[in-house]
Amino acid sequence: MKKYILAMALFISACLPAYADSAAKMGEDWQKISIYDVKNPAVLFGEDWAALASGNKDSLNAMTIGWGQFGMLWGRPIVTVYVAPERYTNEFMQKNEYFTVIGFPKDKKEALTYIGSHSGRSGDKLKTAGLTPEFTDLGNPIFKEGNLAIECKIIYKESFKPELMDEKAKAFYERTKLSPHVAYIGEVINVWQKK
């Protein structure tokens, strides 16, 4: 029985996608830093944009985000991100206990525009955008082309409630025809920047 299990394990590992092995580790050009050393997080969401990723080596998705906050909650450093339920990334956020927020140099704005306007349901948008997945020691996706990566564990999630919104927020959802976003609060576990 042990030989059979070992043989099956070897067979299964040989059949895994090649990218799972080649992208399994973060490059050595990433350096761990403190969340307190992140420069001007408002610029990350507001001006530079960022990618939100969730999943693992077998299946992942990412999208561009422009809404988010850094802060403290329950004595822990946190990042809050917002995802419309219609987004494919939301399926990954619901299934996984971690997410990553990845910042990029300004020359990657075209890639961020692409992953923000195309769905991963219909093809490998990350490859088309020229983004190369790498994975943290916890198995969470980041991108080789990024220059900042924040790994978070989801500690709270909840959909916005229309009855609690002001008129401007309600008008946003009426105009865009989106369902109210889901807020994901993640405790910051690790932060890296490029050397």
Each predicted region: which residue ranges?
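Positively charged n-region of N-terminal signal peptides that target proteins for export
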Residues: M1-Y4
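Bacterial N-terminal signal peptides
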Residues: A7-C15
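Sec/Tat signal peptide C-region and signal peptidase I cleavage site
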Residues: L16-A20
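Basic, polyanion-binding surface patches
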Residues: D21-K195
